[in-house]
Every structure is written in C-alpha cells, then in structure tokens.
C-alpha cells in the first residue's frame, strides 16, 4: 500500500528506534506514520517551526534525507538540500535540523564553496549510536560536529587522499560499540574514520 500521491518521490525512510510501528519518510517534505504506514501526516509547517516553503536563507527544497539514533529515540535528524539564486547563479546548500519535542531547530547551514559542494546524490547523514550530539553529513566531503552543543560543524575529511575519496553516498556507524567508527561509502570505495580524530584526520 502506497502513501498519498502528495507524498511521492520518497527518498528517505527510518524507523523510530524504540517503536517499530512509527516510521519516518522524506522526499521534498518530512512525514510520520504511527501505525506501520497505514496513515501519514506531515512533520513540518509553522506548528513545528519549520516551513518547507519558507526556509531560512531562501533555500528552495530539492531533496531531504533523514536519520535516527538509539542514543535519543525521540529525535529525528534531517538533511535538507536546497538551492537559491545568488548573483545570477544557482547555488546549492543545506540545512541540518533536529526534531525534538515536536519542534525543529536548525543546527547547521552551509552553501557550496570550492571543492565542498552539494548534489542530489551525495546526501548521507549519520548520528553516533552512542552519542546523539555527534552528527555527521556529507556531500563531496564529510562535515560534522563531535558535540553539537559545543563544537561547530566543520570539515572532517580531505577532498581526496589520506584514506578518503570524494563524493559520499552513504555513512554508517558501527553498531554495538562503545567508540564506534564511521564508515563512508564513496566514489573510491569504503573509507573508515576513527575517533577521536578532529578535523580531517583519522581515515
């Protein structure tokens, strides 16, 4: 059974870590089902503090990816890819947002710059399974924060070299580990980042 036609072009799915009947879905908006997919409702709008038709920085949504973590089952994380016109050019960028207590907050905003640029196919996002504040996402490179409450998002990989290859398609943390490594599927294969390794190191 498919969901309402309004919700077509779904690209992201995630189950709530502590409730197998609750499913999140994303495409150009974000949705929730609390009954195993029988009915769906939006998780955005003014009542949630995140209006997809009026995003900060005038970004127009292209695609959204989502993820969850067992470290904070009530949280939903979103990677919102968009575009905007700047100086007669179309520039890609993204917001990273967290839904908690029925309210979204944007924790990171970034626009394409140099070799760090966005595309529809490079939209990986992952959160540590043991630390809900360790958030990482990727485009051509890995970007992240080891603690979103105190550490600004920054580059966590080179463009190419030193164990890493550009253009990231997937990010997955090791499960059932006290200090999990981050695995990265990219155009060069699979790269692995160990922690703690700030900045571009650890690959």
What are these regions (language model features)?
Residues 1-203:
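Beta-propeller blade termini and top-face loops
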């Amino acid at each position: 059974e498919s969901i309402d036609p309004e919700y077509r072009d779904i690209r992201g799915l995630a189950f709530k870590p502590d409730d197998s009947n609750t499913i999140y879905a994303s495409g150009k908006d974000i949705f929730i089902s609390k009954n195993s997919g029988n009915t769906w409702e939006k998780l955005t709008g003014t009542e949630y503090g995140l209006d997809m038709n009026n995003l900060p920085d005038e970004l127009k949504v292209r695609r959204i990816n989502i993820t969850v973590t067992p470290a904070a089952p009530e949280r939903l994380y979103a990677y919102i890819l968009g575009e905007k016109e700047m100086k007669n050019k179309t520039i890609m960028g993204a917001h990273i947002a967290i839904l908690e207590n029925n309210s979204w907050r944007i924790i990171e905003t970034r626009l394409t710059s140099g070799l760090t640029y966005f595309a529809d196919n490079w939209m990986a996002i992952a959160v540590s399974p043991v630390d809900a504040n360790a958030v990482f996402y990727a485009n051509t490179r890995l970007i992240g924060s080891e603690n979103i409450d105190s550490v600004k998002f920054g580059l966590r990989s080179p463009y190419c070299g030193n164990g890493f290859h550009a253009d990231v398609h997937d990010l997955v943390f090791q499960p059932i580990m006290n200090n999990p490594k981050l695995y990265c599927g990219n155009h060069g294969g699979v790269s692995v980042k160990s922690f703690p390794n700030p900045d571009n190191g650890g690959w």
